[in-house]
């Protein structure tokens, strides 16, 4: 099922056939460099894909969605919305991950802008956060390009990350 489309991308629910390209993405150390748990095995990827397929039990409207090229259907990565507790406050994180062969094309920014619009217009969310690991300059640039600003730091079992945030109330989202 399609969640949203942008000029170049389709974000859709994951399908079982996405396992192979998702595993290719997850086993790449460059792509997973800023993930505290590093690369993933095939079994770990399969388990995560099952979570994507079943959705979040408490927030089924949220999730990470397969991000594919609109014209070819080529799997490019994943982008979406995840529930988090930050400092005891429930938040929704905008998360994105694109195949390194397509880095530098603005695809993560385009996907993130589409998800921001979906969060504001369809889900009626009032605010989003983005959790950026220290040193991840590319992810930081995407967060800033979609209008997020540094709000502080968050520490949990995964480590310390920078929290970028953006209100969705009364704000337009740039088109790509």
What is the predicted role of each segment?
Residues 104-118, 137-145:
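Conserved acetyl-CoA-binding loop-helix of GNAT-fold acetyltransferases
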Residues 1-101, 114-118, 122, 131-133, ...:
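GNAT-family acyltransferases
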């Amino acid at each position: 099922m399609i969640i949203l489309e942008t000029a170049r991308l389709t974000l859709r629910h994951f399908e079982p056939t996405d396992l192979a390209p998702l595993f290719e993405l997850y086993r790449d150390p460059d792509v997973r460099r800023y993930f505290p748990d590093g690369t993933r095995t095939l079994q770990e990827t399969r388990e995560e894909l099952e979570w994507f397929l079943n959705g979040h039990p408490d927030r089924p409207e949220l999730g990470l969605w397969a991000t594919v090229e609109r014209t070819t259907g080529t799997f490019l990565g994943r982008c979406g919305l995840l529930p988090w507790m930050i400092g005891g406050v429930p938040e929704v994180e905008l998360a994105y991950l694109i195949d390194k062969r397509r880095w530098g094309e603005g695809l993560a920014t385009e996907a993130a802008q589409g998800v921001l619009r979906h969060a504001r217009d369809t889900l009626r969310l009032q605010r989003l956060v983005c959790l950026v690991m220290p040193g991840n300059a590319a992810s930081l640039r995407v967060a800033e390009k979609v209008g997020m600003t540094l709000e502080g730091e968050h520490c949990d079992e995964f480590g310390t990350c920078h929290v970028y945030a953006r209100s969705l109330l009364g704000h337009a989202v740039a088109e790509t």
